[in-house]
Design a protein with these regions (language model features):
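Helix-coil boundary/capping segments in enzymes
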Residues: 1-116
Length: 116
């Protein structure tokens, strides 16, 4: 089967930007324990099974420091250019510096395709 994943998240728990996964607890949305691990492009490739991944769109998952997330992602994904990846980055459009933030995001990667 061929797939384009239009919405996924990568993270490295050691970065401290996903505190909800550091000590997951069952709640109304379920048990996050299976997600409480690093998940990056290499893990995706190892766990995809028979799925032919034609492309992916990483959607911002670090609302606290989206610029740092984009810097990290471009480094992680640089080694996986064949994945045909794109980014939806975080920019708070209600802030006066939104244009500056968006310009910073776009300067970090030519693969920015959207804003969240």
């Amino acid at each position: 089967m061929q797939v384009v994943d239009p919405h996924l998240h990568f993270w490295a728990l050691g970065q401290g930007n996903q505190p909800w996964l550091e000590h997951p607890a069952a709640n109304l949305l379920g048990d996050y324990t299976p997600m409480a691990r690093d998940f990056g492009p290499q893990t995706l490739l190892e766990e995809r099974g028979d799925i032919e991944l034609l492309g992916l769109v990483h959607v911002e998952a670090d609302a606290v420091n989206p610029i740092a997330e984009t810097q990290w992602l471009t480094g992680e994904l640089a080694e996986h250019d064949k994945l045909n990846w794109a980014l939806v980055v975080g920019v708070d459009l209600s802030q006066p510096d939104a244009q500056v933030q968006l310009e910073k995001q776009c300067a970090l990667s030519e693969r920015v395709r959207g804003v969240r």
